[in-house]
């Protein structure tokens, strides 16, 4: 059995073909899919859970699981309400991981200090919910700036949890 560990199934670009796409995946031997719940904005991070609930249990479809998290460029939206929503989503049985979270210094987005603070808040929620993390980390060209910051944050705020995770986006050498 194959497992797709990172699929943005809630993206609108798949809306018209989502059921057929999942059916083709199942026919090709994909038995499970982790739908990444980041949405187009932080408030939409529940979209992957919605897809899971729509398709789970249907014949000829892979088993779907979801993650929930705030993408680095959306961390400026991580107010108390959004963080409470993340906490609630991580309590749902189908939501098995927190992500895609991390740091992205390559594209212009949320300021670096906002990304770092947002990541720390999400790590705290994931640890409290005992959910692994899915990390997205991308630095500027030819530098390790994002990676240096990420490892410092993980050492201080994630390692003590004893939980694991997956490095999804890698741009290092």
What are these regions (language model features)?
Residues 1-173:
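Mid-domain alpha/beta scaffold segments of enzyme catalytic cores
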């Amino acid at each position: 059995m194959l497992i797709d560990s990172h699929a943005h199934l809630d993206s609108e670009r798949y809306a018209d073909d989502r059921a057929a796409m999942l059916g083709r995946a199942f026919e090709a031997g994909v038995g499970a899919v982790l739908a990444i719940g980041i949405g187009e904005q932080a408030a939409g991070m529940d979209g992957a859970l919605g897809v899971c609930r729509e398709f789970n249990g249907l014949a000829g479809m892979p088993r779907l699981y979801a993650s929930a998290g705030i993408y680095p460029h959306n961390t400026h939206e991580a107010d108390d309400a959004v963080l409470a929503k993340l906490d609630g989503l991580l309590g749902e049985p189908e939501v098995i991981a927190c992500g895609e979270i991390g740091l992205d210094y390559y594209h212009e987005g949320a300021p670096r200090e906002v990304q770092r603070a947002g990541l720390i808040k999400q790590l705290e929620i994931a640890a409290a919910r005992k959910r692994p993390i899915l990390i997205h980390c991308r630095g500027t060209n030819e530098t390790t700036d994002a990676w240096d910051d990420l490892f410092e944050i993980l050492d201080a705020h994630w390692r003590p949890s004893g939980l694991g995770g997956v490095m999804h986006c890698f741009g290092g050498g």
